[in-house]
Amino acid sequence: MDAVLVLVFILSSLVFLSLWRQSSERRKLPPGPTPLPIIGNFLQIDVKNISGSLTNFSKVYGPVFTLYLGMKPTVVLHGYETVKEALIDHGEEFAGRGDFPMAERINKGLGIVFSNGNRWKEIRRFSLMTLRNLGMGKRNIEDRVQEEAQCLVEELRKTNGSPCDPTFILSCAPCNVICSIIFQNRFDYKDQDFLTFMKKVNENVRILSSPWLQVCNNFPSLIDYCPGSHHKITKNVNYLKKYILEKIEEHQESLDIENPRDFIDYYLIKLKQANHNQQSEFSLENLTTTVSDLFGAGTETTSTTLRYALLLLLKHPHVTAKVQEEIDQVVGRHRKPCMQDRSHMPYTDAMIHEVQRFIDLIPISLPHAVTCDIKFRDYFIPKGTTVITSLSSVLHDNKEFPNPEVFDPGHFLDKNGNFKKSDYFMPFSAGKRICAGEGLARMELFLFLTTILQNFKLKSMIHPKDIDTTPVVNGFASLPPSYQLCFIPV
């Protein structure tokens, strides 16, 4: 009986504390729905369609509102003007990385994606500089992507025009590009170490996209005490870091300071230079996490976009025909597509932009945090508050993109058929935390897609009108449904 009374007292105290904290915080923060004790507004959010839930809230509370995901407040930014004002006009103040408990348990604040403060600035600056250096070498990044595009074509030829699921092959190509940048070497598509490594990376992205992970991130105590797929992420990350560490040790043995070969070499040189600096952010542990981040951010996202692009091209054969006509006119059949071609291929460029806009791959981006107390649109947001941005509300703005739910490359073409830029194009987010690999990803999408369409006719297994392009998961990432197609050589 005493134990029951103690439990009731503890639960009552928690409820009271939750109510007291929420009432005092809510007086200062932007408006929002009334939260329940402990669980906040979680039951009011569709974890399978978070962006849709945010749109519904914005209709009631405006473009800046507060949700309680658990006991902590989260400020939501909805619509282009609001997102731009925060991430670009007040970029420094909104440059923090917000709460993502699952990643914090794994990365311990290291790496480039989930780090904060000076550590994040140092690692990001170094990573961007190194990618530029690798792009300006004797064998630059475009050469690597072109080489991989040809390997991709050869693998697709092996299907002999038979029906196939393109998921595996389209995952190999961008993963191999990252391998060549990080490890210097690409891998054969049948290499078992490569296949296992790629499988772990892709599996983690899929788990991170699941509704269960959204629950874990909002109630972090579940991470330690409940069974579930989140434990698989930890095992996969441990495997990836062990593999990466083995590669680092190989590089240490063969390092030539005067002739860095890849990202790891550049980092090891930086590590030697900072060896006597106790305040340095450069360590072997940070290197393994940074490399893991680069693979996680730069492989599955690009391969998913490629997979979605082919599905949309099957759904809209008239678009495919126009792209292939442009490829024939500009590139022809006897040379490889290159990045210089893009400025002469406005329809193809518009098609790729429209794929990224339409699929809305990362609907709410990763969480931001304010780095200091800030008054934003007459609301006070305390330092450290988590902020999420609805990229869906920008990419699917019906004034900038008429009929935004329709796939139409015309959204990025002017009346004369020239490519038309849009400030609303934010699939890589915006501001200080914009994706560090944006340039590489855009290069891969252009070169991989044009090379595929230069060499193959895409044949659907069903009538185009029956093709479903609805994402199967719409939590952290929007993933396309499984499908098969035939790559018919031309």
Curated annotation (Swiss-Prot):
Record bears the keyword Iron: yes
Membrane topology (UniProt): Peripheral membrane protein
Subcellular location: Endoplasmic reticulum membrane; Microsome membrane
Record InterPro entries: Cyt_P450 (IPR001128), Cyt_P450_CS (IPR017972), Cyt_P450_E_grp-I (IPR002401), Cyt_P450_sf (IPR036396), Cytochrome_P450_fam2 (IPR050182)
Coiled coil (UniProt feature): none
EC top class, as a word: oxidoreductase
Predominant place of localization: endoplasmic reticulum
Gene, per the UniProt record: CYP2C25
Cofactor list: heme
Listed EC numbers: 1.14.14.1
GO molecular function, one term: heme binding
Protein name per its UniProtKB record: Cytochrome P450 2C25
Functional note: Catalyzes the hydroxylation of tolbutamide and the N-demethylation of aminopyrine and benzphetamine. Also has testosterone hydroxylase (16 beta) activity.
